[in-house]
Amino acid sequence: MQVELLNDQGLSSSKVDVSDTVFGREYNESLIHQVIVAFQANARQGTRAQKDREQVRHSTKKPFKQKGTGRARAGMTSSPLWRGGGRIFPNMPDENFTHKINKKMYRAGMASIFSQLAREGRLAVVDSLTVDSPKTKVLADKFKAMNLNSVLVIADQVDENLYLASRNLVNILVVEPRYADPLSLVHYKKVLVTKAAMDQLKEMFA
């Protein structure tokens, strides 16, 4: 498998050979779906909470007498049928949203995503990506010159200048290979990988 090598203007200067094990796999939609769903589920805080009929503030006094009013009988105002009453099946903060996915499946899913990106021309290689100062404008101008407005950069090493320059840019994310996730890979229109990061990705997902 070959992918484009981009210059500073975002133009293809040549092609580089990449590992078929990581970038030449068949597209497995169901596996990719599993990997992304598991990633999103495991990222949930699980802190949402609602109150049931015991937890809402209420009085145990009977709202009105049992008979003679023509209304349906009611025992207390905390009933889920009443405004301000508790939920029947409330969301509780101890709910576990964890989705287990095997390491082999995760590696295969990530490799399938990288392979599809390469086939679609959304994956490209750059020699390196550095900035001399932690200025957002410097990095923004660099991507503007490359005609990129939605890009995930996987760099072998993200120094302080690069991190500070990129963190305030919309639709730009710079990460190291170990922090690359399936959701970001499919979200951004273009994925740039430095040459050194390519070797790390091969070790991680081969």
Swiss-Prot record:
Residues 58-70 have a biased composition (Basic residues). Keywords: Ribonucleoprotein, Ribosomal protein, RNA-binding, rRNA-binding. Residues 46-77 are annotated as: Disordered. Pfam families: Ribosomal_L4. SUPFAM superfamilies: Ribosomal protein L4. GO terms for molecular function: rRNA binding; structural constituent of ribosome. The keyword RNA-binding applies. GO terms for biological process: translation. One of its GO terms (cellular component) is ribosome. InterPro entries: Ribosomal_uL4, Ribosomal_uL4-like, Ribosomal_uL4_dom_sf. One of the primary rRNA binding proteins, this protein initially binds near the 5'-end of the 23S rRNA. It is important during the early stages of 50S assembly. It makes multiple contacts with different domains of the 23S rRNA in the assembled 50S subunit and ribosome. Belongs to the universal ribosomal protein uL4 family. Part of the 50S ribosomal subunit. PANTHER family: 50S RIBOSOMAL PROTEIN L4 (PTHR10746), LARGE RIBOSOMAL SUBUNIT PROTEIN UL4M (PTHR10746:SF6). This is Large ribosomal subunit protein uL4. It comes from Polaromonas naphthalenivorans (strain CJ2). The lineage of its organism: Bacteria, Pseudomonadati, Pseudomonadota, Betaproteobacteria, Burkholderiales.
